[in-house]
Amino acid sequence: MYLISLRGNILGVDSKKENKPYQIQEVIRMGLHCWVDVWWHNEGFYLGTNEPYYPIKPAFLNMFALWCNAMNFETLIKLKEQKAPHYFQWKGEPLMTNTLHIITDTISEMGLSDTLLITDEYDSLNLPLKGIISDNIASFKEG
């Protein structure tokens, strides 16, 4: 099962570390995967929660265990060109990654084995999910 840190958060939301490249690398060194918010801005890639903030090199996006959330349509196109693992969230609806995983915050009986669930509910570990996405992912790793 994939354990995916939401924006580099490990033990709850830490806005000072969210989407910070160093924090993302630390999460991956811990053996976790990481969801990052990616922007295409001023002819380059950036990470940032509400706006493009941290400039990154394109190679950063191809790091193993990274899940790239395109923050707008232009970014989605650029991520596709980069061949980075990516998806584009549309109005909170369930979405599908380019690697055919489903990301959602609700559970459906269909497709659980391909589903990445956004949750902080620990009983979700008993489901046959593909992975868990959480701001508190360390709790899942310990459990």
Where is each model-derived feature located?
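Phosphate-group recognition and catalysis centered on beta-loop-alpha active-site segments
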Residues: 1-143
